[in-house]
Amino acid sequence: MAKSKFERNKPHVNVGTIGHVDHGKTTLTAALTRVCAEVFGGTAVAFDGIDNAPEERERGITISTSHVEYDSPTRHYAHVDCPGHADYVKNMITGAAQMDGAILVCGATDGPMPQTREHILLSRQVGVPYIVVFLNKSDLLADDCGGADSEEYAEMLELVEMELRDLLSEYDFPGDDTPIIPGSALMALKGEDDNEMGTTAVRKLVETLDTYIPDPERAIDGAFLMPIEDVFSIQGRGTVVTGRVERGIIKIQEEVEIVGIVDTTKTTCTGVEMFRKLLDEGRAGENCGILLRGTKREDVQRGQVLAKPGSITPHTQFEAEVYVLGKDEGGRHTPFFKGYRPQFYFRTTDVTGACSLPEGVEMVMPGDNIQMTVELIHPIAMDEGLRFAIREGGRTVGAGVVAKILK
């Protein structure tokens, strides 16, 4: 059989399931593949195929993640599901699986639980822009209340919904406007649909993903940004900086800023080359060399970025959500305390920074995740959502994401 060609005619959207342990994230993931395969074509993936998540290494951290895909009439979804809570923490902080939107799975019989809250907080910290709620096990709640058309069931459902909306609002998500879909993932997985809680509910969830999560901005549509990896001077032509374009497009004769470490300067791109060929432009994802007019070799260094003027600014102080590697992951063997000064590796370079811990936290153990405030000794070009590694002498001991810029 010929290998099927990957159709690029639909927008590609990254989603994932989040929520408390045993509320049904993996069952829902399997149900989504089954329902979409049946209704819109594609391949169903069994529960076991998702639950045995392969281990991956991301920035030196071992994470177990399952990746599945499914289609709606208008989109192609790539979906991540993690077996354990620690895997979610690592996944979201390292950005190993960046989500354009998350499906928060909450058991209707339990209501919001500690990890429900923690995953909403993590989503806020790492910049997951949209959350849709699937209120799972609604069939069990209906059984407990004397049926899906009983008054008690309607009241209980409303209570859980209110709790969830309050929780979402607490972390600056639009709780009142968040879609909440009651249903049963297990029913949908088995192909059942009593009281429209199975297949119908999961179809409704897919329709909600289609309408509530907007098409993500593609890297190429962003404001031009290229982290500088190397600097050369070419006799008679000037200074060339090389790197991989992170987002946007750079054209010849466009003005750019050199941002980070020292004061921001302006210059003009007078040439773009790739594999020794001269081009009119450099695009997101491409490794290229950019010739800069009137810029001296010593005015530019690795760790700075080349960017569209005004699109990014340098900062030294920020709040971060950090995961500290466990001893078995090659991390530290001992805790660290406030005033800890490791290197923070942003894009292409290490910068020393001092850590302040939240009130009441004396020390941080290997394997913890923590919110901390960091003050760098040099400014770095950053946006909220930028990922970094924490290193000691070139060895990764943690991973983090900029949650809020302070200065």
From Swiss-Prot:
Residues 19-26 are annotated as: G1. It catalyses: GTP + H2O = GDP + phosphate + H(+). Mg(2+) binds at T26. The keyword Repeat does not apply. PROSITE patterns: G_TR_1, G_TR_2. This is Elongation factor Tu. GO terms for molecular function: GTP binding; GTPase activity; guanosine tetraphosphate binding; translation elongation factor activity. Its EC number is 3.6.5.3. GO terms for cellular component: cytosol. GTP binds at residues 19-26, 81-85, 136-139. GTP hydrolase that promotes the GTP-dependent binding of aminoacyl-tRNA to the A-site of ribosomes during protein biosynthesis. Residues 60-64 are annotated as: G2. It comes from Marinomonas sp. (strain MWYL1). Keywords: Cytoplasm, Elongation factor, GTP-binding, Hydrolase, Magnesium, Metal-binding, Nucleotide-binding, Protein biosynthesis. Monomer. Residues 184-186 are annotated as: G5. Residues 10-217 form the tr-type G domain. InterPro entries: EF-Tu_GTP-bd (IPR041709), EF-Tu_GTPase (IPR050055), EFTu-like_2 (IPR004161), EFTU_2 (IPR033720), G_TR_CS (IPR031157), P-loop_NTPase (IPR027417), Small_GTP-bd (IPR005225), T_Tr_GTP-bd_dom (IPR000795). Residues 81-84 are annotated as: G3. It is found in: Cytoplasm. Residues 136-139 are annotated as: G4.
